[in-house]
Each structure stands twice: as C-alpha cells, then as structure tokens.
C-alpha cells in the first residue's frame, strides 16, 4: 500500500532523503518528521552544511584527498614522509588509516578500484597521476592498501605493472585484513599492524 502524506512538502523531503544510500522510506519519513520537530534554525544550519560541503569542498591537487584548500593538510605537512605513499581506494580509507596513528607517510586516493562488472576501468581511476608522482623522483616506496578482494588484487597488479619501470619499492599491506574485507571496516589495531608488517609486492602477493 502506498504511503499517503498530509503534505506534498513532507513527501518531497521523504523522497530526497530516501535517495540516500542505506536509507529506506520508513527511515526517511522518521528523519523528515524529526526535522519538523526541530526549530527552523537547526534545519537551516543542517541544510547549509550540506550545501557548503558540496559547493566548497576541494580535492587535493597532489593526492586527491578532500580538503579546504588546494593542498590537503597531510600533503602540506613537512613532518610527513613524502617519500612513502600509501595508495587507497577512497577517502574513507585515508580516515581509517589516519585513525591508527601508525602511518607517517602521505597518500594517493584512486577514487575506486578496477571493477569490470561495474564498468570501472583503469582510465576511470587516478592511476596516471600516481605514475607522475613516482616519475618526479621523490617517492621511494608505494604501499598498496586496497581491499583484499578480487577487484583490489586486480588493481594492485595493474599499478605494479605501470610502475615496474621506475626505481620505487612496491609493497602491500599484510593480510591481517581478512580476504574480502574492505579497509575501512578493519579495526584500528589490525589495520595498523597490516601497514607496519607490509611485505614487498610480487606477482604471487594477490594469491597469498
């Protein structure tokens, strides 16, 4: 049975909220009614924060992490080891690794992983900019910290092949993260140890 709404404005709000990932129509209705119970100032601040996020957030021109300026705070920090680059799928992985407090290098955010089933190929990722960073000569080690899935392993292999002609060490995080797990869901201790105990990448790494 279709839900009937006493107001078209309420229905519109529910429709928009229900378009968010993981939010069903019942949850969307509950959120919309919650907003109605709050004062107008709260709702205005909430909406303004979302608009500012979409309009004003920038992407670091070096690593593609999100930031408020042209370069993110990690890349701009002279105390970080800029010769050590950790390659991750998305921004959530940067946040997860930073929370471990075990990594003092910098990052490179690919924006996804190779997934033919989803129509995502190497050209859809920020692999070329990673190659350019390595070609500049400052990078001494690349840590591949992608999800331990078939897609993650495929992406690792592609990057390894792209960087094979450069004088750079390529390592992969230890398999403390279970096969099929995504980096962002690993606990901080396990993830931190996986980075510390990383091993050199080779053609059999994805099968280990």
Curated annotation (Swiss-Prot):
The Toprim domain covers 83-178
Instruction: Quote any Pfam family the record assigns.
Output: Toprim_4
Output the superkingdom of the source species: Bacteria
Q: Give the SUPFAM superfamilies listed for this entry.
A: Recombination protein RecR
Keywords, A to Z, come to: DNA damage, DNA recombination, DNA repair, Metal-binding, Zinc, Zinc-finger
Q: State the PROSITE patterns in the record.
A: RECR, TOPRIM
Protein name, entry field: Recombination protein RecR
Which organism is the protein's source?
A: Parabacteroides distasonis (strain ATCC 8503 / DSM 20701 / CIP 104284 / JCM 5825 / NCTC 11152)
Q: Where are the zinc fingers (C4-type)?
A: 60-75
Q: Which family does it belong to?
A: Belongs to the RecR family.
Q: Which InterPro entries match?
A: DNA_Rcmb_RecR, Rcmb_RecR, Rcmb_RecR_Znf, TOPRIM_dom, TOPRIM_RecR
The record's function comment reads:
May play a role in DNA repair. It seems to be involved in an RecBC-independent recombinational process of DNA repair. It may act with RecF and RecO.
One BP term from GO: DNA recombination
Q: Name one GO molecular function term.
A: zinc ion binding
